Amino acid sequence: MWTGRQLNPHRAAAVATYSGDSFLDIGCGNGQYVLHFKDKFETAGVDIQEYPQWAEAPKKFQVGDAARLPYDDASVDTILSFETLEHVPNPKAVLEEFHRVCRKNIIFSVPNCEVPSSLAASRLTFFHYTDRSHVNFFTRDSLTEMLVETGFRPQDVGLINACPTQPFLNELLALPSFLTRLVGKFAKKDVFRMTILAVASKG
């Protein structure tokens, strides 16, 4: 059970900017976004299992499957789904289900598989590839293509959650501290943005 999900400022800003009057958070986990925005939007959440935090507003949550949502066609303005599609057996079918249920748009995120050359050359492995619950691997191009195939019009497909690559390389090389500082002065300042955040309107 994943209980550590907290509000991410990039995702929260996207919700505040793009959500319609109502949203349904699929794979909502502990319900942070549902609870945080409950006074601004009509909110609800679905996850494959129940979480203790749902007790704060039990009528807003229910257990359900992302590929077979217990909602009527066009029943909410916006679908949210953060870090969900990498886990499901058939992400295209899930996006088609999102298309059925939403009236306006979807806002979602997945791990970014566009690993920068400096990190790839180090042979360090992005945790996304070692998590056995992750069965799908997306780039911005592959995600955009799937959105179009499932009837959405991509509005914004960008990268968030920047992480400098140099600390990973320092740890791999196990350099003395003075060499670490020296390398840091001259090394290319690569940044790996770990997450794709996408907004797409219903076609």
Predicted regions, residues:
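A SAM-dependent methyltransferase catalytic signature shared across enzymes that methylate proteins
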Residues: L143-G158
